[in-house]
């Protein structure tokens, strides 16, 4: 590739980031060194892999799952599969129609892959999950048996004590934020709209032993830019910057919007908290990667 071609091709589409165009299945993989016999299971990863070979941003592009199965001290297989979404087969399908209606079955499901309650789910924060088989074939859109009304963040949190899966979905129209809780058995048992100021892009959140923590930050959805194919998010100096703390619900007590305590913080954006916990004094500590601002469009 020439220097000119490398300059013209975005970094997320060249070199090690370039899309993989073949689906491969391989068995009895060669191993350098040794794999402990006790290490057994599947390692899966998800990422943007545009089938067309082009995407405007590395957040875009069709989802592709790569997987390796380890068992009995051997690497049993490797395979990679596109997540067979509507967006893959109907690239021009719009999740948001001109009238503002939203179809959450449309999405690239390219950000994360999780296992919970016997389900393997490929996630993207704009849409419903996609269920996969153990061999990484796509089963289809999964909406918790019709109970899920919001999108599902690509970064849900699994409680190691209860086995519950906590997640949220943000919306371009009210309700702008919905908190959801799934039992260890895989049933959606709680959905709570949470009041935030506007259509903010909430990429991630935190849970601690006793609390759920939301970040209501000044990167907001821009409907007009979305309709013209531009970057649909922008920085808004007038949007309040807040962190919300809500007690976690239990079998005996349910908490929701009225129980959220909001704290004003300095303007910033956070994609991901690395850790959140309660110290011995009961204070909540959050470790985050903090940007002073993001996607300003002056």
Regions found by a protein language model. Name each.
Residues 1-298:
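Beta-propeller domains
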């Amino acid at each position: 590739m020439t220097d000119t071609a490398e300059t013209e091709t975005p970094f997320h589409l060249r070199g090690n980031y370039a899309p993989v165009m073949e689906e491969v299945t391989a068995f009895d993989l060669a191993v350098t060194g040794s794999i402990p016999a006790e290490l057994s299971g599947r390692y899966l990863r998800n990422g943007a892999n545009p089938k067309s070979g082009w995407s405007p941003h590395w957040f875009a592009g069709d989802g592709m799952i790569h997987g390796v199965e380890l068992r009995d001290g051997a690497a049993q297989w490797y395979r990679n599969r596109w997540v067979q979404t509507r967006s893959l087969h109907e690239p021009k399908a719009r999740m948001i129609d001109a009238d503002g209606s939203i179809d959450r079955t449309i999405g690239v499901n390219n950000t994360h892959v999780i296992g919970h309650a016997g389900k393997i789910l490929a996630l993207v924060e704009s849409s419903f999950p996609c269920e996969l088989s153990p061999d990484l074939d796509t089963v289809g859109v999964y909406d918790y048996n019709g109970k899920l009304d919001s999108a599902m963040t690509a970064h849900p949190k699994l409680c190691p004590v209860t086995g519950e899966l906590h997640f949220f979905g943000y919306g371009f129209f009210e309700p702008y934020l919905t908190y959801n809780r799934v039992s260890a058995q895989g049933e959606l048992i709680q959905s709570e709209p949470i009041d935030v100021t506007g259509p903010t892009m909430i990429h991630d959140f935190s849970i601690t032993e006793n609390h759920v923590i939301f970040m209501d930050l000044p990167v907001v959805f821009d409907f007009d830019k979305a309709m013209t194919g531009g970057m649909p998010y922008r920085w808004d100096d007038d949007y309040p910057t807040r962190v919300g703390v809500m007690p976690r619900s239990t079998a005996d007590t349910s908490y929701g919007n009225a129980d959220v305590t909001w704290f004003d913080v300095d303007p910033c954006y956070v994609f991901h908290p690395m850790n959140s916990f309660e110290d011995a004094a009961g204070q909540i500590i959050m470790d985050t990667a903090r940007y002073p601002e993001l996607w300003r469009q002056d």
